[in-house]
């Protein structure tokens, strides 16, 4: 998909394609459509990030709360989004043994209790051995810095999902903006 | 459900229950959870409305763009949310004859083209005869005032959905705020 195609989309198509760039937050894609045309992947991505950065703290926490636990209830029940299912699978989180899964559930619960949002991590940049270590480490962080870290992970996930959709075309098919 | 119960919910439960108060915008419910405890339905509702009002214009348009057309593609394909299905059914929009449905589709398309968001109306406060008349009327409005009208309809829908969930209990079970 190239940017000429992206810039020609009506809002219905745009939300169909980009609605889950930020997990379960089609509102953000639907808002970003207002900023078209986009000059390339980076420009499009920057509009997603600017929207996130401009939200009040409750809204930023709200974004995090729309994310599933890693190796959590949604994975067990088969109710993950397609994107999250693929990402957790690539990190090996869909094939944990019972002990590792219970250990992660316990850490996830502690994290949710401490910060009021779930542990968010770009799973594709991690693996089954690293996830619980990183979770245990971030559990010790201060709430203010942890919110920033978690939003940084949301942006990494968004970048990877946008790259999946736009791939190499996004750089080669830059369009002239008016 | 009374407010004691609502105020005791963790964010996962809260988003499960209130995630579609604003159509397909669980981000808003997830943000509102930060404002607990709530003294009653009106207080809870005001936090939803305050979040909507504080969004930049693109975000407000984004909320509208997460709504389906009335008697549109999602209804035909069976992909409406449960709440929207019920509301459109109560307004008689699920049993239109072909001529009426095509007329509405045509008006919806004109409206989306003119304003850049879909026609949003609290269907439960309307009926199959009124919907196309109101759509044709609002199609003539100025974009600025039409955005305000449409967000007012989002709030009416949210109010009705909250009342469905909280009903009479919400007034009788007020809790003391700290």
From Swiss-Prot, chains A, B:
It comes from the Eukaryota. Transmembrane segments: none annotated. GO terms for biological process: adenosine catabolic process; allantoin metabolic process; amide catabolic process; AMP catabolic process; dAMP catabolic process; deoxyadenosine catabolic process; deoxyguanosine catabolic process; deoxyinosine catabolic process. It catalyses: 5-hydroxy-2-oxo-4-ureido-2,5-dihydro-1H-imidazole-5-carboxylate + H(+) = (S)-allantoin + CO2. InterPro entries: OHCU_decarboxylase, OHCU_decarboxylase-1, OHCU_decarboxylase_sf. Its main location: other. It is found in: Peroxisome. GO terms for molecular function: 2-oxo-4-hydroxy-4-carboxy-5-ureidoimidazoline decarboxylase activity; carboxy-lyase activity. Substrate binds at residues 68, 84-88, 119-123. Pathway: Purine metabolism; urate degradation; (S)-allantoin from urate: step 3/3. Its EC number is 4.1.1.97. Belongs to the OHCU decarboxylase family. Catalyzes the stereoselective decarboxylation of 2-oxo-4-hydroxy-4-carboxy-5-ureidoimidazoline (OHCU) to (S)-allantoin. NCBIfam families: UHCUDC. This is 2-oxo-4-hydroxy-4-carboxy-5-ureidoimidazoline decarboxylase.
């Amino acid at each position: 998909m190239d940017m000429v195609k992206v810039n020609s989309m009506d809002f219905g198509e745009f939300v169909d394609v980009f609605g889950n760039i930020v997990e379960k937050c089609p509102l953000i894609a639907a808002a970003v459509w207002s900023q078209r045309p986009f000059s390339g992947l980076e420009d499009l991505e920057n509009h997603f990030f600017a929207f996130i950065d401009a939200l009040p703290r409750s809204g930023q926490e709200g974004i995090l709360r729309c994310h599933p636990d890693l190796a959590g209830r949604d994975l067990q029940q088969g109710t993950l989004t397609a994107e999250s299912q693929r990402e957790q699978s690539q990190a090996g989180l869909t094939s944990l043994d019972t002990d590792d899964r219970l250990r992660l559930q316990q850490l996830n619960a502690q994290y949710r209790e401490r910060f009021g949002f779930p542990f968010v991590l770009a799973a594709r940049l991690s693996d089954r051995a690293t996830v619980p270590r990183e979770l245990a480490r971030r559990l010790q962080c201060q709430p203010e810095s942890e919110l920033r870290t978690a939003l940084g992970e949301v942006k990494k996930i968004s970048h990877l999902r946008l790259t999946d959709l736009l791939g190499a075309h996004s750089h080669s098919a830059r369009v002239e903006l008016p």
